[in-house]
Structure formats: C-alpha cells, structure tokens
Amino acid sequence: MPEDAGPEAVRSGLPAAPEPADALDAADVPERADVQDTAAAPLVAAQERSVQLDAGWSVGPTGMRTRHAARVLLVDDQDRVLVVRGHDADEPSRHWWFTVGGGIDPGESAHEAAVREVFEESGLRVAPEDLVGPVVTRSAIFDFARESCLQHEEFFFVRLTHDGRLVRDGWTEIETGFIDEMAWLTTTELRATTDEVFPRDLPDIVDDLLAGWDGVVRAIGLERD
C-alpha cells in the first residue's frame, strides 16, 4: 500500500509490476480517431511483449492502436471516487491512478459499456439510468506494452447508494497483469499522491460534480498520459 494515501482510503490490493516510453508529441496529434501521425513508433513483435493489447484495439494507417472507451467517475456516500492503480507491464517503475472503465465493444453503446466495465472491474452493479452524462470527454495518448495508443473517452458520473465492497473476479488476464489495487480515495488524497493521476484534473472534476453538474460536457481535448 502506498504511503501517500490517507487513512480514509479503502483498498483492494493485488500483484505488483511495469511503465512507458516517450514516442509521440501529443501536440502533433489531432483530437479524434482520424489521427494523422508521422512519428508513430514501430509496433513491437507480440512475442517480445510481456502483455499484449486485446482485440478491442485497431491499428490505423498511422500504426497507432486506437479505440473508443467509456469511463466512470463512481463516487460513494463519503465523497470518495473509485480509482485504480496500475503500471505498464513492460516498465515496472511507473505507477498511476486512473478511473474505472474500458473499451466499447462492437454494437455496444457508451452507456452499456460503462455499466459492464464497472461490474467487471469492481463487482459493483449500476444501472444505465444511474449514469449522469457523459460529463467529460477527452482523448489520451499513452504508451503500453511498448506501443503508443490513442483512446477516445467518455466519462459518466455515478453516485453509489449501496455497499461499495470491491471484488476482482471479472478481471481479464491483461488487467491482472498491470493493475496493482483499487481504492476509494477522496479528492484530497488524490491531490496528495506522488503517483500520476489521469485525467490530470480528476480531483477538480470530481469536486465540481459533487457541487452539482451544470449539464455542460467538459471537453478536455487531447492529453498525453
């Protein structure tokens, strides 16, 4: 358990493990999936990677893996947001906190993907009608398994009104390979951590939502994670 998390943190621990490399300048990459990148790093042979991306990622003409994803800002009755601490399975020194969520499957809506991902990653059940939003959108470039990836994300807000006990029975092999733990953290704890947090403005986003959503989607644009 990291020393930087306060006593209020409720955690579900896990194995340990890896981090990313510098490849793309985010300023050179447009915001949506029709990205035109001339500096993408070559793909690494699958057998050289300790972790491989799943089939939900498609390789575009730029050579960069791309997908659309639904993420959830799940907040409990103590105003703590559920976050996941992970690492890159090929670079174990870098750790970061991020939100629950994942790729949108073919034929699936963002709402359906959000509900499914919450259950698979945490064991918690939410209904589509519990989702507020999307409240935030962003595109993120990050390195994983020695590849530069581009993910377009929609974030939903959910207030949890029942027991927030966490289970990891639904984790995939990839998730068990790079996720260290899950935790309910306050925005104060997120600001205090020495690990990176994504999105970078996550504490401010959650605080604003707790004060009441004004119905305006917060468009973050492109970030380099």
Label each region the model flagged.
Residues 2-4, 41-77:
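Acidic, metal-coordinating catalytic segment for phosphate/diphosphate chemistry
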Residues 74, 85, 157-159, 183-189:
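Short, well-ordered beta-strand micro-motif
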Residues 2-10, 14, 163-225:
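Nudix hydrolase/Nudix homology domain
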Residues 125-135:
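A short coil-to-beta-strand element that immediately follows conserved catalytic motifs
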Residues 138-169, 205:
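Active-site-adjacent beta-strand/loop module that shapes the phosphate/pyrophosphate-binding cleft
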Residues 53-62, 142-146, 170-172:
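Short, P/G- and charge-enriched loop/turn segments at secondary-structure junctions
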Residues 80-121, 125:
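Conserved Nudix-box catalytic region and its N-terminal flanking loop in Nudix hydrolases
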Residues 3, 8-9, 16-40:
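Asp/Glu-rich intrinsically disordered low-complexity tracts
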